[in-house]
Protein backbone atom coordinates (compact mmCIF):
# COMPACT_ATOMS: atom_id res chain seq x y z
CA UNK A 1 0.00 0.00 0.00
CA UNK A 2 2.80 2.40 0.90
CA UNK A 3 4.55 1.59 -2.37
CA UNK A 4 1.32 2.30 -4.28
CA UNK A 5 0.83 5.66 -2.51
CA UNK A 6 4.46 6.57 -3.18
CA UNK A 7 3.97 5.76 -6.88
CA UNK A 8 0.85 7.94 -7.00
CA UNK A 9 2.78 10.75 -5.29
CA UNK A 10 5.69 10.48 -7.76
CA UNK A 11 3.32 10.44 -10.75
CA UNK A 12 1.40 13.46 -9.42
CA UNK A 13 4.66 15.34 -8.79
CA UNK A 14 5.60 14.90 -12.46
CA UNK A 15 2.13 15.27 -14.00
CA UNK A 16 0.82 18.37 -12.18
CA UNK A 17 3.53 20.74 -13.53
CA UNK A 18 2.77 19.48 -17.06
CA UNK A 19 -0.97 20.07 -16.55
CA UNK A 20 -0.26 23.59 -15.25
CA UNK A 21 2.08 24.33 -18.17
CA UNK A 22 -0.49 23.16 -20.76
CA UNK A 23 -3.28 25.10 -19.01
CA UNK A 24 -1.23 28.32 -19.03
CA UNK A 25 -0.30 27.93 -22.72
CA UNK A 26 -3.96 27.27 -23.62
CA UNK A 27 -4.96 30.39 -21.70
CA UNK A 28 -2.30 32.56 -23.35
CA UNK A 29 -3.42 31.37 -26.81
CA UNK A 30 -7.13 32.01 -26.05
CA UNK A 31 -6.61 35.47 -24.58
CA UNK A 32 -4.06 36.35 -27.26
CA UNK A 33 -6.55 35.38 -29.97
CA UNK A 34 -9.27 37.49 -28.35
CA UNK A 35 -7.00 40.55 -28.08
CA UNK A 36 -5.70 40.10 -31.64
CA UNK A 37 -9.19 39.89 -33.21
CA UNK A 38 -10.38 43.03 -31.42
CA UNK A 39 -7.18 44.95 -32.25
CA UNK A 40 -7.47 44.01 -35.94
CA UNK A 41 -11.10 45.13 -35.89
CA UNK A 42 -10.02 48.40 -34.24
CA UNK A 43 -7.40 49.05 -36.95
CA UNK A 44 -9.97 48.25 -39.65
CA UNK A 45 -12.84 50.37 -38.28
CA UNK A 46 -10.73 53.10 -36.63
CA UNK A 47 -12.91 52.83 -33.51
CA UNK A 48 -13.66 50.37 -30.72
CA UNK A 49 -16.92 49.87 -28.84
CA UNK A 50 -17.03 49.87 -25.04
CA UNK A 51 -17.56 46.10 -24.79
CA UNK A 52 -14.62 45.47 -27.13
CA UNK A 53 -12.46 47.81 -25.05
CA UNK A 54 -13.34 45.82 -21.93
CA UNK A 55 -12.69 42.49 -23.68
CA UNK A 56 -9.35 43.64 -25.12
CA UNK A 57 -8.12 45.05 -21.80
CA UNK A 58 -9.35 41.92 -20.01
CA UNK A 59 -7.50 39.65 -22.45
CA UNK A 60 -4.31 41.75 -22.12
CA UNK A 61 -4.39 41.63 -18.30
CA UNK A 62 -4.90 37.87 -18.40
CA UNK A 63 -2.04 37.37 -20.85
CA UNK A 64 0.21 39.21 -18.37
CA UNK A 65 -1.16 37.17 -15.45
CA UNK A 66 -0.64 33.84 -17.25
CA UNK A 67 2.86 34.82 -18.39
CA UNK A 68 3.79 35.72 -14.79
CA UNK A 69 2.52 32.32 -13.66
CA UNK A 70 4.36 30.54 -16.49
CA UNK A 71 7.64 32.32 -15.73
CA UNK A 72 7.18 31.52 -12.03
CA UNK A 73 6.68 27.84 -12.87
CA UNK A 74 9.78 27.75 -15.09
CA UNK A 75 11.94 29.54 -12.50
CA UNK A 76 10.72 27.16 -9.77
CA UNK A 77 11.58 24.11 -11.90
CA UNK A 78 14.92 25.40 -13.25
CA UNK A 79 16.27 27.42 -10.29
CA UNK A 80 14.49 26.65 -6.97
CA UNK A 81 16.98 28.80 -5.00
CA UNK A 82 16.11 31.89 -7.06
CA UNK A 83 12.39 31.15 -6.74
CA UNK A 84 12.66 30.99 -2.93
CA UNK A 85 14.61 34.27 -2.60
CA UNK A 86 12.67 36.88 -0.57
CA UNK A 87 13.01 39.64 -3.17
CA UNK A 88 11.86 37.32 -5.97
CA UNK A 89 8.84 36.21 -3.91
CA UNK A 90 7.89 39.82 -3.14
CA UNK A 91 8.21 40.99 -6.77
CA UNK A 92 6.33 37.94 -8.10
CA UNK A 93 3.57 38.40 -5.50
CA UNK A 94 3.10 42.07 -6.37
CA UNK A 95 2.98 41.39 -10.12
CA UNK A 96 0.51 38.53 -9.59
CA UNK A 97 -1.71 40.67 -7.35
CA UNK A 98 -1.85 43.52 -9.90
CA UNK A 99 -2.57 41.30 -12.92
CA UNK A 100 -5.07 39.11 -11.04
CA UNK A 101 -6.87 42.15 -9.58
CA UNK A 102 -7.25 43.74 -13.03
CA UNK A 103 -8.40 40.45 -14.56
CA UNK A 104 -11.16 39.94 -11.98
CA UNK A 105 -12.35 43.55 -11.97
CA UNK A 106 -12.46 43.81 -15.77
CA UNK A 107 -14.52 40.60 -15.87
CA UNK A 108 -16.81 42.23 -13.29
CA UNK A 109 -17.09 45.33 -15.51
CA UNK A 110 -18.09 43.04 -18.38
CA UNK A 111 -20.76 41.40 -16.20
CA UNK A 112 -22.20 44.79 -15.20
CA UNK A 113 -22.11 45.93 -18.85
CA UNK A 114 -24.11 42.89 -20.01
CA UNK A 115 -26.59 43.42 -17.18
CA UNK A 116 -27.21 47.10 -17.97
CA UNK A 117 -27.39 46.55 -21.73
CA UNK A 118 -29.59 43.44 -21.78
CA UNK A 119 -31.80 43.46 -18.68
CA UNK A 120 -35.22 45.13 -18.84
CA UNK A 121 -36.56 46.94 -15.77
CA UNK A 122 -38.84 49.95 -15.44
CA UNK A 123 -37.06 51.26 -12.34
CA UNK A 124 -35.93 54.88 -12.70
CA UNK A 125 -32.58 54.06 -11.04
CA UNK A 126 -31.94 51.19 -13.47
CA UNK A 127 -32.85 53.35 -16.49
CA UNK A 128 -30.59 56.13 -15.19
CA UNK A 129 -27.66 53.68 -14.97
CA UNK A 130 -28.55 52.03 -18.30
CA UNK A 131 -28.37 55.36 -20.16
CA UNK A 132 -25.01 56.12 -18.53
CA UNK A 133 -23.42 52.69 -18.88
CA UNK A 134 -20.03 54.11 -19.96
CA UNK A 135 -19.85 56.32 -16.85
CA UNK A 136 -20.90 53.40 -14.65
CA UNK A 137 -18.12 51.19 -16.05
CA UNK A 138 -15.61 54.04 -15.67
CA UNK A 139 -16.59 54.54 -12.01
CA UNK A 140 -16.32 50.78 -11.30
CA UNK A 141 -12.88 50.72 -12.94
CA UNK A 142 -11.71 53.74 -10.90
CA UNK A 143 -12.99 52.10 -7.70
CA UNK A 144 -11.05 48.95 -8.64
CA UNK A 145 -7.86 51.03 -9.00
CA UNK A 146 -8.41 52.56 -5.56
CA UNK A 147 -8.92 49.07 -4.08
CA UNK A 148 -5.79 47.84 -5.89
CA UNK A 149 -3.74 50.68 -4.39
CA UNK A 150 -5.23 49.96 -0.96
CA UNK A 151 -4.57 46.23 -1.36
CA UNK A 152 -0.93 46.76 -2.36
CA UNK A 153 -0.37 49.32 0.40
CA UNK A 154 -1.88 47.21 3.19
CA UNK A 155 -0.23 43.98 2.04
CA UNK A 156 3.23 45.54 1.77
CA UNK A 157 2.79 47.22 5.17
CA UNK A 158 1.73 43.89 6.66
CA UNK A 159 4.73 42.16 5.07
CA UNK A 160 7.14 44.84 6.36
CA UNK A 161 5.68 44.58 9.87
CA UNK A 162 6.01 40.80 9.81
CA UNK A 163 9.62 41.00 8.63
CA UNK A 164 10.50 43.61 11.28
CA UNK A 165 8.90 41.56 14.06
CA UNK A 166 10.43 38.35 12.71
CA UNK A 167 13.99 39.73 13.04
CA UNK A 168 13.33 40.70 16.67
CA UNK A 169 12.31 37.15 17.62
CA UNK A 170 15.06 35.04 19.18
CA UNK A 171 13.32 31.82 20.18
CA UNK A 172 12.63 28.32 18.91
CA UNK A 173 12.41 27.42 15.23
CA UNK A 174 8.91 25.95 15.64
CA UNK A 175 7.60 29.21 17.12
CA UNK A 176 9.19 31.19 14.29
CA UNK A 177 7.54 28.92 11.73
CA UNK A 178 4.11 29.34 13.33
CA UNK A 179 4.62 33.10 13.60
CA UNK A 180 5.60 33.32 9.94
CA UNK A 181 2.59 31.20 8.96
CA UNK A 182 0.35 33.50 11.00
CA UNK A 183 1.74 36.55 9.18
CA UNK A 184 1.17 34.96 5.79
CA UNK A 185 -2.37 33.98 6.79
CA UNK A 186 -3.10 37.61 7.73
CA UNK A 187 -1.88 38.74 4.31
CA UNK A 188 -3.97 36.03 2.63
CA UNK A 189 -7.06 37.04 4.62
CA UNK A 190 -6.66 40.65 3.49
CA UNK A 191 -6.31 39.51 -0.12
CA UNK A 192 -9.46 37.35 0.12
CA UNK A 193 -11.47 40.28 1.53
CA UNK A 194 -10.39 42.60 -1.30
CA UNK A 195 -11.11 39.96 -3.97
CA UNK A 196 -14.55 39.25 -2.51
CA UNK A 197 -15.78 42.75 -3.43
CA UNK A 198 -16.22 42.06 -7.18
CA UNK A 199 -17.98 38.78 -6.37
CA UNK A 200 -20.45 40.65 -4.12
CA UNK A 201 -21.01 43.09 -7.00
CA UNK A 202 -21.43 40.38 -9.67
CA UNK A 203 -23.82 38.10 -7.78
CA UNK A 204 -26.77 40.58 -7.66
CA UNK A 205 -26.38 41.32 -11.38
CA UNK A 206 -26.61 37.58 -12.06
CA UNK A 207 -29.79 37.23 -9.98
CA UNK A 208 -31.34 40.33 -11.56
CA UNK A 209 -30.52 39.00 -15.04
CA UNK A 210 -32.38 35.78 -14.21
CA UNK A 211 -35.35 37.79 -12.92
CA UNK A 212 -35.30 39.98 -16.04
CA UNK A 213 -35.27 36.88 -18.28
CA UNK A 214 -38.15 35.35 -16.30
CA UNK A 215 -40.34 38.47 -16.57
CA UNK A 216 -39.50 38.90 -20.26
CA UNK A 217 -40.28 35.23 -20.95
CA UNK A 218 -43.67 35.56 -19.23
CA UNK A 219 -44.53 38.56 -21.40
CA UNK A 220 -43.44 36.77 -24.58
CA UNK A 221 -45.53 33.68 -23.75
CA UNK A 222 -48.65 35.82 -23.86
CA UNK A 223 -47.90 36.94 -27.43
CA UNK A 224 -45.68 34.38 -29.18
CA UNK A 225 -45.65 30.61 -28.66
CA UNK A 226 -42.60 28.40 -29.24
CA UNK A 227 -40.26 31.17 -30.45
CA UNK A 228 -37.22 32.75 -28.90
CA UNK A 229 -36.85 36.47 -29.68
CA UNK A 230 -33.60 38.45 -29.85
CA UNK A 231 -33.91 39.73 -26.27
CA UNK A 232 -34.33 36.20 -24.87
CA UNK A 233 -31.29 35.00 -26.85
CA UNK A 234 -29.26 37.96 -25.55
CA UNK A 235 -30.35 37.14 -21.99
CA UNK A 236 -29.24 33.51 -22.37
CA UNK A 237 -25.84 34.47 -23.83
CA UNK A 238 -25.23 37.00 -21.06
CA UNK A 239 -26.27 34.45 -18.42
CA UNK A 240 -23.90 31.83 -19.87
CA UNK A 241 -21.00 34.28 -19.61
CA UNK A 242 -21.92 35.40 -16.10
CA UNK A 243 -22.50 31.82 -14.86
CA UNK A 244 -19.09 30.73 -16.17
CA UNK A 245 -17.47 33.77 -14.54
CA UNK A 246 -19.15 33.19 -11.16
CA UNK A 247 -18.51 29.43 -11.20
CA UNK A 248 -14.79 29.81 -11.93
CA UNK A 249 -14.60 32.71 -9.49
CA UNK A 250 -16.22 30.60 -6.73
CA UNK A 251 -13.67 27.82 -7.30
CA UNK A 252 -10.88 30.42 -7.16
CA UNK A 253 -12.14 31.94 -3.89
CA UNK A 254 -12.76 28.51 -2.33
CA UNK A 255 -9.17 27.45 -3.08
CA UNK A 256 -7.91 30.60 -1.32
CA UNK A 257 -10.19 29.92 1.66
CA UNK A 258 -8.86 26.34 1.79
CA UNK A 259 -5.33 27.76 1.99
CA UNK A 260 -6.41 30.08 4.80
CA UNK A 261 -8.17 27.38 6.86
CA UNK A 262 -5.59 24.64 6.21
CA UNK A 263 -2.42 26.66 5.96
CA UNK A 264 -0.25 23.70 6.99
CA UNK A 265 -0.96 22.23 3.54
CA UNK A 266 1.14 25.03 2.03
CA UNK A 267 4.22 23.05 3.12
CA UNK A 268 3.26 20.37 0.58
CA UNK A 269 4.50 21.04 -3.01
CA UNK A 270 1.62 19.05 -4.55
CA UNK A 271 -0.97 21.22 -2.81
CA UNK A 272 0.79 24.39 -4.02
CA UNK A 273 0.78 23.04 -7.59
CA UNK A 274 -2.89 22.14 -7.28
CA UNK A 275 -3.70 25.69 -6.11
CA UNK A 276 -1.79 27.15 -9.06
CA UNK A 277 -3.79 24.94 -11.45
CA UNK A 278 -7.01 26.26 -9.89
CA UNK A 279 -5.76 29.86 -10.15
CA UNK A 280 -4.80 29.35 -13.80
CA UNK A 281 -8.17 27.79 -14.70
CA UNK A 282 -10.04 31.06 -14.14
CA UNK A 283 -8.20 33.30 -16.66
CA UNK A 284 -7.52 30.42 -19.06
CA UNK A 285 -10.94 28.82 -19.55
CA UNK A 286 -13.13 31.90 -19.07
CA UNK A 287 -11.57 33.37 -22.23
CA UNK A 288 -12.94 30.45 -24.29
CA UNK A 289 -16.41 31.00 -22.80
CA UNK A 290 -16.17 34.62 -23.98
CA UNK A 291 -15.02 33.52 -27.45
CA UNK A 292 -17.95 31.10 -27.81
CA UNK A 293 -20.40 33.73 -26.55
CA UNK A 294 -19.30 36.46 -28.98
CA UNK A 295 -20.41 36.05 -32.61
CA UNK A 296 -17.41 37.88 -34.09
CA UNK A 297 -14.90 35.94 -32.00
CA UNK A 298 -16.69 32.66 -32.67
CA UNK A 299 -16.66 33.24 -36.44
CA UNK A 300 -12.98 34.22 -36.34
CA UNK A 301 -12.12 31.07 -34.34
CA UNK A 302 -14.06 28.89 -36.81
CA UNK A 303 -12.15 30.52 -39.68
CA UNK A 304 -8.84 29.75 -37.97
CA UNK A 305 -9.88 26.12 -37.31
CA UNK A 306 -11.00 25.74 -40.93
CA UNK A 307 -7.69 27.16 -42.14
CA UNK A 308 -5.74 24.77 -39.90
CA UNK A 309 -7.84 21.86 -41.17
CA UNK A 310 -7.34 22.75 -44.85
CA UNK A 311 -3.67 23.75 -44.55
CA UNK A 312 -2.20 20.19 -44.72
CA UNK A 313 -4.16 19.50 -47.91
CA UNK A 314 -2.94 22.79 -49.38
CA UNK A 315 0.69 21.92 -48.54
CA UNK A 316 0.28 18.46 -50.13
CA UNK A 317 -1.10 20.12 -53.29
CA UNK A 318 1.94 22.42 -53.46
CA UNK A 319 4.30 19.45 -53.05
CA UNK A 320 2.65 17.70 -55.99
From Swiss-Prot:
Cytoplasmic side: 36-62, 116-135, 213-240, 292-320
CC annotations in GO: membrane
PROSITE patterns given in the database record: G_PROTEIN_RECEP_F1_2
Keywords: G-protein coupled receptor, Glycoprotein, Membrane, Receptor, Sensory transduction, Taste, Transducer, Transmembrane, Transmembrane helix
Extracellular side: 1-14, 84-94, 157-191, 262-270
Keyword Transmembrane: yes
Any one biological process term the GO annotation gives: detection of chemical stimulus involved in sensory perception of bitter taste
Pfam family membership, one: TAS2R
Membrane-related topology note: Multi-pass membrane protein
Gene Ontology MF annotations: bitter taste receptor activity; G protein-coupled receptor activity
Record: glycosylation sites: 170
Domain of life: Eukaryota
InterPro entries: GPCR_Rhodpsn_7TM, TAS2R
Protein family: Belongs to the G-protein coupled receptor T2R family.
Function, as annotated: Putative taste receptor which may play a role in the perception of bitterness.
Listed PANTHER family: TASTE RECEPTOR TYPE 2 (PTHR11394), TASTE RECEPTOR TYPE 2 MEMBER 109 (PTHR11394:SF25)
Name of this protein: Taste receptor type 2 member 109
Encoding gene (name): Tas2r109
Amino acid sequence: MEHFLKSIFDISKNVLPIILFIELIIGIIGNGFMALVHCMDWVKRKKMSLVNQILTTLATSRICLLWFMLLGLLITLLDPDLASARMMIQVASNLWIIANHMSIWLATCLTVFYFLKIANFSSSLFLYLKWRVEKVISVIFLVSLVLLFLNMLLMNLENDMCIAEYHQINISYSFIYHYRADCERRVLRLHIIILSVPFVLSLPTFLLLIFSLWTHHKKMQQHVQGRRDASTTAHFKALQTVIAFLLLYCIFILSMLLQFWKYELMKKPLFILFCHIVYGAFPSFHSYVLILGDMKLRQASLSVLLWLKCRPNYIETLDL
